[in-house]
UniProtKB/Swiss-Prot annotation:
The lineage of its organism: Archaea, Methanobacteriati, Methanobacteriota, Stenosarchaea group, Halobacteria. InterPro entries: Cyt_kin_arch, Cytidylate_kinase_dom, P-loop_NTPase. This is Cytidylate kinase. It comes from the Archaea. It comes from Natronomonas pharaonis (strain ATCC 35678 / DSM 2160 / CIP 103997 / JCM 8858 / NBRC 14720 / NCIMB 2260 / Gabara) (Halobacterium pharaonis). GO terms for cellular component: cytoplasm. The keyword Plastid does not apply. Its EC number is 2.7.4.25. The keyword Cytoplasm applies. One of its GO terms (molecular function) is CMP kinase activity. Disulfide bonds: none annotated.
Amino acid sequence: MLITISGPAGSGKSTVAAGLAESLGYEHVSGGDIFRDLADDRGLTPLELNKRAEEDDQIDRDLDRKQRDIAESRDDIVLESRLAGWMAGEHADFRIWLDAPLSVRAERIADREDKSVELAHNETKERGKSEALRYREYYNIDIEDRSIYDLALNTARLSPDGVRAVVESAVNAYAPDDDEGQTPVEGVTYEF
């Protein structure tokens, strides 16, 4: 089974994806892992590649193509990134969206990255706007469209263990024989 976990920065997707993969005995592949591999392939550090990505849209496209390739060719995996649900498309068996209010996500990011909440809030807000524009421009994806997801959860309402329990319960309850059809991923331009 291919499970995707998507959501904005600070939503808890990495924490939940790692825990879910561990409990299922699946491999966890994150967009961050793929990005680090791309940096390695180019002989760059992730920070250097990130700087180049600001000027070169092909870097984002390479990351997204890798996600799509993984979704097409692998199974028993939890694929996690902002666009994992969209990039996996019809190959995903179960798509999950995690979110939290911007103020909560900013606090989490500030704690994780040892910066002020105000700075994290401003950076996260700007990053979200920038990503939304790029996703629309590159692939015709409206990142605010949650219709493709089988489960959407506000992670601010539960502890990390509570979020993981809800996600695990939903995934374990999923039975392919009872599946009457997932929402198709339509209108996306997979041009990398």
